[in-house]
């Protein structure tokens, strides 16, 4: 298991670098008005890849073994390397010669210490959000210690960037630009809202329809398609008009409509038409991520675009973890209380009620074993908890909309 975890760390580091680097290359090769369209194409490819990765990996694991899920990536990456070497233009000046001494000097300027403090600090802060309330209680010494360590490590990162780093991995002066801060905040909020919804939708259909994991996951496709279409349309809009604030505001409004519909209409007897209520959520997120990328580029000095883009891509996983953690925390807080109340109405209290609540919270397939009356109230409690989870997504979308309203109404030349 340790070897698998180490491999995932290496793979994730390279994958994250590739995504950010691809975005930087696009901004180098295309006019800013066209960047949104090209970035939306990149998002489409990434979405297709993420959508195919799970089913293909599962198929390989079920047929020839899970190891081939890792071996199979090697020829794909090799093909990508060859393609980049052939197709990408060489932007390095022709007469530039880099000797060993110059290369060594450049290597020494890399802010390895700042990168270490930033990476470990974020890990220490975000890890308790993943395990809190699930693996360990929120007030566990492990959770509190990780939070404290994360704060300390990020403080050391700030000191390193301000005092010691020759070329900071992330110049803190960028945060003096409110457009940069707003762009990061909108990305965090929209991603948190979308991921919170994407996590809850399969659970909803597993509980209310007793759907298999595959069928429940398939209900996410309307949101995925909406995300793709939203990104493509936004790219075309920005290319034609040069305006990016209006899509940012509209994105939050459209997403909010989706979450309101889920709260009001998903009561456990959802029909096929109502299953498309998640489409506006994906559509709004696609609009937002394309528009915010351009808003960030328009607000910064070109020499800062690489680090600014990296910060934007860092905001997305932060939002993902916050969205999952907030949704889970809301479920953990609401569902047991609601279920206990419903069980009392059935005359079930005390140790018997605690046993039912514990089993219902631990596994969805308990619904297949429980008596009909208990299964019904467990389902209702799940639905109530998910309503509050969608409320978190709605709050995030409202925050994103409010922030977008505060951004400058710029227009690209």
Please place each PLM-identified region on the residue numbering.
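Helix-loop-helix hairpins in multi-pass membrane proteins, especially solute transporters
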Residues: 1-113
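Helix-loop junctions at membrane interfaces in 12-TM secondary transporters
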Residues: 1-8, 264-278, 334-338
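Interfacial helix-cap and linker-helix signal at transmembrane-aqueous boundaries
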Residues: 4, 56-64, 129, 133, ...
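Transmembrane alpha-helical cores of Major Facilitator Superfamily
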Residues: 9, 40-48, 52-53, 188, ...
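Small-residue-rich alpha-helical segments with characteristic i,i+4
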Residues: 49-58, 274-354, 388-392, 405
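Hydrophobic transmembrane-helix bundles of small-molecule transporters
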Residues: 67-185
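Transmembrane core module of solute transporters
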Residues: 141, 145-152, 156-307
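Transmembrane-helix exit segments and adjacent C-terminal regions of multi-pass membrane proteins
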Residues: 361-413
């Amino acid at each position: 298991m340790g070897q698998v975890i180490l491999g995932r760390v290496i793979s994730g580091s390279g994958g994250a670098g590739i995504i950010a680097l691809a975005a930087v290359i696009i901004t180098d090769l295309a006019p800013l008005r066209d960047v949104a369209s090209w970035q939306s194409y990149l998002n489409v490819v990434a979405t297709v890849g993420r959508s195919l990765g799970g089913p293909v990996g599962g198929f390989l694991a079920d047929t020839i073994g899970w190891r081939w899920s890792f071996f199979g990536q090697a020829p794909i990456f090799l093909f990508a390397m060859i393609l980049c070497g052939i197709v990408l233009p060489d932007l390095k000046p022709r007469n530039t010669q880099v000797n060993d001494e110059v290369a060594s000097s450049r290597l020494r300027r890399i802010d390895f210490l700042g990168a270490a403090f930033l990476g470990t600090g974020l890990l220490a802060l975000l890890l308790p959000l993943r395990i809190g309330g699930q693996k360990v209680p929120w007030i566990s010494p492990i959770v509190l210690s990780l939070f404290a360590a994360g704060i300390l490590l990020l403080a050391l990162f700030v000191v390193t960037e301000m005092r010691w780093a020759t070329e900071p991995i992330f110049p803190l002066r960028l945060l003096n630009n409110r457009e940069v801060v707003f762009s990061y905040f909108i990305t965090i909020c929209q991603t948190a809202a979308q991921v919170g919804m994407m996590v809850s939708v399969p659970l909803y259909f597993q509980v209310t329809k007793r759907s298999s994991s595959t069928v429940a996951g398939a209900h996410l496709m309307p949101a995925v398609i909406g995300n793709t279409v939203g990104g493509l349309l936004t790219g075309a809009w920005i290319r034609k008009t040069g305006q990016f604030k209006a899509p940012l505001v509209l994105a939050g409004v459209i997403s909010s409509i989706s979450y309101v519909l889920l709260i009001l209409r998903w009561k456990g007897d959802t029909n096929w038409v109502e299953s498309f209520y998640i489409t506006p959520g994906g559509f709004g997120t696609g609009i937002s991520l394309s528009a915010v990328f351009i808003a960030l580029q328009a607000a910064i000095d070109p020499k800062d675009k690489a680090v600014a883009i990296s910060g934007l891509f860092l905001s997305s996983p932060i939002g993902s973890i916050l969205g999952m953690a907030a949704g889970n925390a809301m479920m953990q807080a609401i569902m047991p209380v609601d279920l206990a109340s419903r069980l009392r109405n059935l005359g079930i209290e005390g140790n018997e009620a605690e046993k039912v609540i514990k089993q219902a919270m631990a596994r969805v397939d308990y619904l297949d074993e429980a008596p009909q009356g208990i299964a019904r109230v467990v389902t209702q409690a799940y639905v109530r908890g998910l309503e509050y989870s969608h409320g978190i997504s709605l709050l995030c979308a409202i925050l994103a909309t409010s922030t977008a309203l505060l951004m400058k109404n710029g227009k690209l030349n």
